[in-house]
């Protein structure tokens, strides 16, 4: 239904101003940001399509899963929504990036990674949306407080493309007591390969020589993360 056909107090913008953002659904909040639809497609329908958006190259049942998953949408993903021109795409990408940065800042300010879930959420924010495969390391102090997150390698990850010496040097630089290894799978699956397991064991053995523990190796994809420690693969 076009917004002009709704009662004034049911229109998203007016509803937000009168009752606050908590009174709006995810679709309505997106509609406020989009402002207008196009001929034949109202802004509420456009907002609904965004929330149901499938990631480029994904299977039919592998979508963004609502507003949380939409945080990982790229500009190319948004191009597939009819009527979403460059200006609106740029606004959305900027808002989504601000949201990711705000969430990442909140997580970093907590400083202590007390649970595997906290680590997975933090890494998802930083790695899940990347279009290429990256290998990153969380460097932690003796109280599991974050010292640094560094992306060390890019491309298909193997034992030969990830250099243990570089990981050791960065751990010494940060005076880390422990690390969490991480990489992303842009394909969407988080199942570890045999190469992932072998790489983990190589780094675990190498870092043990300088008394740095490998607490976990986390594999992330949009909307999903896997802890190899929780799977008993460490």
UniProtKB/Swiss-Prot annotation:
CDD domains: MPN_DUF2466 (cd08071). Residues 112-234 form the MPN domain. GO terms for biological process: proteolysis. InterPro entries: MPN, RadC_JAB, RuvA_2-like, UPF0758, UPF0758_CS, UPF0758_N. Transmembrane segments: none annotated. The keyword Aminoacyl-tRNA synthetase does not apply. One of its GO terms (molecular function) is metallopeptidase activity. A motif (JAMM motif) lies at residues 183-196. Keywords: Hydrolase, Metal-binding, Metalloprotease, Protease, Zinc. Zn(2+) binds at residues 183, 185, 196. It comes from the Bacteria. This is UPF0758 protein Rfer_3252. Belongs to the UPF0758 family. Pfam families: RadC (PF04002), UPF0758_N (PF20582). Signal peptide: none annotated.
